[in-house]
């Protein structure tokens, strides 16, 4: 295990949380997500780089321009000309601003006197404008985790970016449904000193945000960006961590990557390694190749003196230095790169590798990296890889990386600089009034859970306290047993999810409908799960329809139990083969009253239980 204190680990977290407001941040469109198939129109753009007010160019944006990609946008009947950047933005959404101020006060922050909107250059296609609108709302706060105080540097109110739905060679497709949804960005100071603490801080920030009851939930509604550095390493920003469970693993693997890159630097220095500036056209070497991957494509290569055996070296689980180079190539629309540490392979023969080495003048101990595809893209990608290879002689480059599902990371772009920010002239500033500052501070989920522990088991108390339907629980717990209400709101949906039922179709009105039916005695508490299942299948069912269906289902349970008992000899003789004749008897009684699939499911379950005894 690594000694993080000795390594000088510093971690800062940025939480991006979508707010559950009626309208988007700068227009009156609803904050709904849509299916791409529902799009009724599309348009495309090419984005160009704008210099800052003092004439500087942001390095991350500059690299994106070199990729010269076409961006296609999916439009809906719930989006407008503001998202398309064909109309100026409206004023800042006051509802979103009040939520941001509320969160700031919960984090002991100083709220600014006047909120000014800025433009942050982003030309990766995720914003039609070529920039993201962001506004500083508060600064200088803190939160406590395990007795340690972690500083909260800033809280910004931002517009959410577009959702990427496709990435191809030379183009990307984005959906406009998400663009403009209000979100808060909370950035901590780099006070976190271990992977475990990073996870705990992120969990606490998430809990504080959910305590407002005004944030969206579900995959993609909250993202963690993590800034990580070690002594002699560099600050690296890892974007898009959606699963809290792997956050500690991401920190651990990034530290490992930086440690390994520093080891590579020392070894390259000892070898006297250097990077040749020339990009060689080696298409002729592969003119008769059997490799389908590079056949009939322009093939170019670069020479890395003294890098032999190092390009193929693992720096994170399942990822090598060559993978870092391949990540760069992919950002230019290529499939990746090949290098001599892994060749011959991919249909490339040993003889072709030998001719490749001769063509670029490689000696023993050297490595050759090559790419195939469109000539211009290959040239640009290899030029960028030359710069990355040079940095191996220096150490760890500052860059923005993407979180992978296994906790490793991939290259995205250089770390952006200060040149990416400039004022937004279309949106007037907002003066923060005393009335706005007097916003109510809500009860924290952890405090609510402690109250519920008097009514429910500890684990269940936390789940209900953290549920978006906790107010429904409080209301109905005055009329029904709290455990019965908890069963309807949490235990039954959890069981249905395990069965593969789409419980996402359930809304608050459905839970209220079922609870009201239990309260009136229309259905037994045991029938609540079946009622919710039926509502998932048909969300518009009425109480009367549910009562009829569940009544029949309860009748069938009794009938099947009695039938299993009466036909014990048949079951003993034929085992699972008894299903067909038993099914016939049940359907004779219930045909037209209960769905055949439901009958089969219940009978199979009862038969399996009888055979296991």
From Swiss-Prot:
One GO cellular component assignment for this chain's record is: cytoplasm
Answer yes or no on keyword Electron transport: no
Q: Does the keyword Nucleotide-binding apply?
A: yes
The highest taxon in the source lineage is Archaea
**EC code(s) of this entry:** 6.3.5.-
The protein's GO terms of the molecular function aspect are: aminoacyl-tRNA ligase activity; ATP binding; glutaminyl-tRNA synthase (glutamine-hydrolyzing) activity
- UniProt keyword annotations, A-Z: ATP-binding, Ligase, Nucleotide-binding, Protein biosynthesis
Q: Where is the signal peptide?
A: none
Recorded catalytic reaction(s): these are:
L-glutamyl-tRNA(Gln) + L-glutamine + ATP + H2O = L-glutaminyl-tRNA(Gln) + L-glutamate + ADP + phosphate + H(+)
Q: Which GO terms describe its biological process?
A: glutaminyl-tRNAGln biosynthesis via transamidation; translation
What is this enzyme's class at the first EC digit? ligase
Q: What does this protein do?
A: Allows the formation of correctly charged Gln-tRNA(Gln) through the transamidation of misacylated Glu-tRNA(Gln) in organisms which lack glutaminyl-tRNA synthetase. The reaction takes place in the presence of glutamine and ATP through an activated gamma-phospho-Glu-tRNA(Gln). The GatDE system is specific for glutamate and does not act on aspartate.
Subunit details: Heterodimer of GatD and GatE.
Q: What family does this belong to?
A: Belongs to the GatB/GatE family. GatE subfamily.
Record-given protein name: Glutamyl-tRNA(Gln) amidotransferase subunit E
Q: Which organism is it from?
A: Archaeoglobus fulgidus (strain ATCC 49558 / DSM 4304 / JCM 9628 / NBRC 100126 / VC-16)
> What lineage, starting at the top, does this entry show?
Archaea, Methanobacteriati, Methanobacteriota, Archaeoglobi, Archaeoglobales
């Amino acid at each position: 295990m690594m000694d993080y204190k000795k390594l000088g680990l510093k971690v800062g977290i940025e939480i991006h949380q979508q707010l559950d407001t009626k309208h988007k941040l700068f227009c009156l469109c609803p904050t709904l997500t849509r299916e791409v198939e529902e799009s009724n129109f599309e348009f495309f753009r090419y984005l160009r780089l704008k210099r800052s007010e003092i004439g500087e160019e942001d390095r991350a944006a500059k690299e994106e321009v070199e990729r010269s990609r076409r961006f296609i946008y999916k439009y809906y009947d719930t989006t407008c000309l503001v998202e398309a950047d064909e109309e100026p933005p409206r004023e800042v959404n006051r509802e979103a601003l009040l939520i941001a101020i509320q969160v700031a006060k919960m984090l002991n922050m100083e709220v600014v006197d006047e909120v000014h909107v800025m433009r942050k250059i982003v030309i990766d296609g995720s914003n039609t404008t070529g920039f993201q609108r962001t506004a500083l709302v508060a600064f200088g706060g803190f939160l406590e985790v395990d007795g340690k105080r972690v500083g909260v540097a800033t809280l910004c109110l931002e517009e959410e970016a577009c959702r990427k739905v496709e990435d191809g060679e030379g183009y990307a497709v984005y959906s406009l449904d998400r663009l403009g949804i209000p979100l808060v960005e909370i950035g901590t100071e780099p006070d976190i000193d271990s992977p475990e603490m990073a996870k705990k801080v992120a969990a606490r920030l998430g809990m504080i945000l959910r305590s407002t009851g005004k944030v969206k939930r579900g995959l993609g509604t909250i993202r963690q960006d993590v800034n990580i550095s070690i002594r002699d390493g560099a600050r690296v920003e890892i974007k898009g961590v959606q699963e809290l469970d792997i956050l500690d693993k991401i920190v651990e693997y990034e530290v490992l990557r930086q440690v390994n890159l520093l080891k590579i630097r020392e070894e390259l220095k000892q070898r006297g390694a250097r990077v040749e500036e020339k990009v060689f056209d080696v298409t002729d070497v592969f003119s008769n190749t059997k490799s389908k991957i590079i056949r009939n494509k322009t093939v170019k290569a670069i020479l890395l003196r003294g890098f032999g055996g190092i390009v193929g070296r693992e720096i994170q689980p399942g990822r090598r230095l060559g993978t870092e180079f391949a990540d760069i190539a992919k950002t230019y629309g290529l499939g990746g790169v090949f290098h001599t540490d892994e060749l011959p392979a991919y249909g490339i023969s040993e003889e072709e590798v030998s001719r490749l080495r001769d063509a670029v003048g490689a000696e023993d101990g050297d490595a050759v990296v090559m790419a195939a595809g469109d000539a211009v893209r290959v040239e640009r990608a290899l030029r960028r890889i030359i710069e990355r290879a040079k940095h191996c002689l220096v150490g760890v480059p500052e860059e923005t990386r993407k979180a992978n599902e296994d906790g490793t990371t991939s290259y995205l772009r250089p770390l952006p600089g200060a040149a990416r920010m400039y004022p937004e002239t279309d949106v007037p500033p907002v003066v923060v009034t005393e009335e706005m500052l007097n916003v109510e501070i809500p009860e924290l989920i952890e405090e609510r859970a402690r109250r519920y522990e008097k009514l429910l088991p500890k684990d269940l108390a936390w789940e209900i306290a953290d549920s978006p339907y906790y107010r429904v629980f409080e209301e109905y717990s005055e009329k029904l047993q709290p455990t019965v209400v908890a069963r309807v709101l949490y235990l039954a949906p959890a069981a249905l999810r395990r069965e593969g039922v789409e419980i996402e179709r359930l809304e608050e009105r459905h839970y209220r409908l079922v609870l009201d039916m239990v309260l009136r005695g229309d259905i037994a508490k045991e029938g609540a799960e079946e009622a919710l299942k039926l509502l998932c299948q048909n969300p518009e069912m009425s109480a009367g329809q549910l009562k009829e269906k569940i009544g029949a289902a309860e009748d069938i349970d009794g009938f099947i139990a009695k039938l299993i008992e009466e036909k014990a000899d048949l079951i003993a003789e034929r085992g699972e083969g008894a299903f067909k004749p038993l099914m016939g008897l049940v359907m004779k009684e219930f045909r037209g009253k209960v769905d055949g699939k439901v009958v089969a499911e219940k009978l199979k379950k009862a038969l399996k239980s009888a055979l296991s005894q």
